[in-house]
């Protein structure tokens, strides 16, 4: 089943702007548009601040019941999507299952760059209580590289006209100026940041400097022949980039089963724990350069991982890449076997010693590891003696196994839900049934034995 993508539109637009993308991405992704307050078919009763728009979106995602999802935000909707994503990753909004974010000419978390004269002109359009057809058409034409075809042009103009003037004004006066840039740290969710080549205030330079730095796993691209209204102007180009990003960067690695994901999203789990599990569940970047090891050493560690922690199915966790991150961040277990150098140096030496054996297939490597464990292997390279290599191999096996067990999908596979011992309330729910083979009503069904 395709992953659900919740789509948040631009100022003066609605979920209608994603119809073309929805058709083009059908079968890969299921796009679901959300009309933000005061736009499309949505009233402004829930409020028009960024916080209020974020809450509306979070509630819509929660009501949907989906447990694997992504966000797509265009212009104004990009700012909202960025806040929702950050509150999901830190666990504070009670959502779980975010896989990726796509931003189209997005308004940044910082105040949006906008020419003062243009802002004043746009405010003037709504001053008399409605945005007229001429003003709406002027807005659409000013935000496209060339005039849209008649049907999308008419829809885009209609969307501007039906925008509630108060919502339009509130964004220009307040929402676009709100500064959320210091509220959240860089977000590790895989992100695709797209800019229209002919956009003005939110063009390529603005996206590179204001949006991309917020995403530590972000990618950037420019869509030719487009200004600001990318989904209307270049739906094929935008869809192709999203599809490639999804297949190459996101659609791999295990997905947390729905019943476990719902427990993680529930009040039984603290925000801090939910945030940790959210980051652990993100897809790895298989083509990313290693941070602590060389590319050759990482390949050897991947071979070692296949032998030491064989994973079922065709969507494994990239354990080696996660251990590389662990080494780069200095997040070891605090123990070093007597006689071994620092963790990073020990890994480099141990992997260099096994490089030739790793190229001869997993079965051969498994036999070599057996000899190492028995203390019967004499390394010919890498700088470690037999005893040191034995100690390092044991340490590496522990690191790989820990990374595997830390993934929420693995926890589901081994029927572990001990993380759900109580949320952030004054009273922890805890567990009532502690006997063997006893399962509480809220617990996931568990893996088949």
Where is each model-derived feature located?
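Conserved alpha/beta-hydrolase catalytic His-Asp/Glu region
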Residues: 112-116, 130-185
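Catalytic histidine-centered segment of alpha/beta-hydrolase-like enzymes
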Residues: 226-239
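Active-site loop/oxyanion-hole signature of alpha/beta-hydrolase fold enzymes
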Residues: 32-72, 76, 83-94, 223, ...
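Conserved HGGG/HGGXW glycine-rich cap/lid loop of the alpha/beta-hydrolase fold
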Residues: 1-43
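Flexible, low-complexity segments enriched for small/polar residues
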Residues: 275-289, 301-393
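Flexible "cap/lid" loop of the alpha/beta hydrolase fold
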Residues: 86-87, 93-130
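Conserved loop-alpha-helix segment in the C-terminal half of the alpha/beta-hydrolase fold
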Residues: 23, 190-226
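The conserved beta1-alpha1 loop
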Residues: 8-10, 74, 195
């Amino acid at each position: 089943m395709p992953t659900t993508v919740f789509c948040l539109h631009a100022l003066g637009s609605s979920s209608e702007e994603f119809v073309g993308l929805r058709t083009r991405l059908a079968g890969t992704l299921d796009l679901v548009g959300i009309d933000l307050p005061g736009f499309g078919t949505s009233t402004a009763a829930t409020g028009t601040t960024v916080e209020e728009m974020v809450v509306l979106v979070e509630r819509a995602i929660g009501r949907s019941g989906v447990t694997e999802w992504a966000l797509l935000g265009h212009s104004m909707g990009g700012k909202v999507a960025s806040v929702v994503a950050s509150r999901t990753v830190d666990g504070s909004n009670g959502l779980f299952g975010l896989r990726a974010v796509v931003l189209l000419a997005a308004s940044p978390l910082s105040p949006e760059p906008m020419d003062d004269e243009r802002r004043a002109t746009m405010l003037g359009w709504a001053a008399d209580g409605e945005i007229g057809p001429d003003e709406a058409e002027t807005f659409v034409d000013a935000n496209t590289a060339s005039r849209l075809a008649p049907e999308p042009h008419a829809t885009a103009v209609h969307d501007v006209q039906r925008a509630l003037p108060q919502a339009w004004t509130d964004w220009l006066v307040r929402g676009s100026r709100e500064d959320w840039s210091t509220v959240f740290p860089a977000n590790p969710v895989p992100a695709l940041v797209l800019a229209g080549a002919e956009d003005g205030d939110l063009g390529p330079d603005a996206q590179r400097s204001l949006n991309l730095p917020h995403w530590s796993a972000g990618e950037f691209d420019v869509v030719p022949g487009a200004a600001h209204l990318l989904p209307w102007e270049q739906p094929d180009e935008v869809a192709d980039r999203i599809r490639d990003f999804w297949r190459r960067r996101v659609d791999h690695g295990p997905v947390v089963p729905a019943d476990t994901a719902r427990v993680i999203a529930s009040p039984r789990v603290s925000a801090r724990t939910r945030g940790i599990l959210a980051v652990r569940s993100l897809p790895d970047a298989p083509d990313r350069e290693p941070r602590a090891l060389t590319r050759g050493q990482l390949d050897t560690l991947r071979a070692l991982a296949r032998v030491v922690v064989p994973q079922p199915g065709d969507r494994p966790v990239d354990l080696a890449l996660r251990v590389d991150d662990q080494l780069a961040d200095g997040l070891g277990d605090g123990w070093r076997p007597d006689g071994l150098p620092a963790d990073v140096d020990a890994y480099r030496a141990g992997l260099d010693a096994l490089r030739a054996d790793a190229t001869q297939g997993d079965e051969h490597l498994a036999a070599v590891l057996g000899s190492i464990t028995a203390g019967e292997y004499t390394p010919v390279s890498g700088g470690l003696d037999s005893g040191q290599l034995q100690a390092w191999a044991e340490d590496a096996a522990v690191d790989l196994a820990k990374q595997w067990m830390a993934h929420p999908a693995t926890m589901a596979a081994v029927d572990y839900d001990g993380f759900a011992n109580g949320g952030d309330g004054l009273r922890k729910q805890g567990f009532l049934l502690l006997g063997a083979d006893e399962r509480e009503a809220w617990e996931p069904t568990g893996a088949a034995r």
